[in-house]
């Protein structure tokens, strides 16, 4: 692979928006390694509007982004590094609606809002799940963009009547940065409206949806043009340059679904599975083509698009959300922060494998009293077991982590069988790669070595796509992953020896 001239480094800014926080990271790339510097972090989370609906305060996110970009510019100047690109990634499915003047109609709904309850079943009565899957390849999730649109888009809806364009969250931010409206394909593949084979909007699904739901007849015209990762979106608007102190920096499309960026930076071998571990765990394989069989649909696997024409064949399983919500509830009850390292150490000392709950149950999706929900789920398995395992917080944490590891192991085993791939290792990237107990339990549950890291996989993937787009690095995915191996600390967990 080619590299930058000796001693010369370039800067790339990754705007990484998650469901609980957003960050602005400066990636300093010399062609062989990437150094990441956090330049801004700000909270995120759904807020209830006057009707009790959950929405994202994207204007607060925008203020955090501008502050982070200003800080990134300061850091780059201190280091003598030129910022050559900016890329945006975020969580999937949620979107903003723009009116004819390009203004946001309302704050975007959160995928956890209850407005989609029951909507998928209504849609499937008109366009079956099997017909959906044959085109979009997506597992059943009740909150995809399609189902949100059915819940909120109709001719009688005042907001929808004003809509000229729909932009997914990272594309909305890119629009505010540049003034150009596009849809990056990896995130667009989570909408339910894309053809997994052609990587284009599905005329078939859109026509059938319009026929079934006349209020959505104009949806196709509201969807922007699709672009692949690495495409130039545009340069910073003058107002953004003034607000941040940055120059005429190019904004580049990256793998804007955060999981797509994370998988791009997972140093995978040809037969490795991955777990992108955060609020959700995205568990699966990287494939050259989608798997659209009936068996795959029945197993509820999804085909989301990845970098360089790849497919992320995966299942969304519950991630650290359940544990995080328990910790939040305990901190609120105690009036003090929870000692999470101490809690995890105590959980490791608990007997394992006594109880596995279905962490993918709908009862765990919404915020709320998560300790009680987990306790109730255990109770449904038997009162004696309930009293034995949930009497202490460490025991409850052990139940959660055992259950998460088991869910990931099941997903890997099923993906392997459905795709015809013999998996020889598991790569865990993202925040969950720092949870040593969960990594060890995953190695035991899968019977495979687990390689943990990088923690900052999403930001690394974001930066590397930008760096390749402008020629600072070159090569295919293997070459990009060589840069990751040189840049990140990886840790290996071996499965327990079999007796």
Language-model-derived ranges and their functions:
Residues 89-92, 229-230, 277-280, 425-433:
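Glycine-rich beta-strand-to-loop/alpha-helix junction loops that act as flexible
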Residues 1-106, 241-252, 446-448, 477:
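N-terminal glycine/serine-rich phosphate-binding loop of ATP-dependent small-molecule kinases
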Residues 109-128:
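Short alpha-helix plus adjacent loop in nuclease-associated cores
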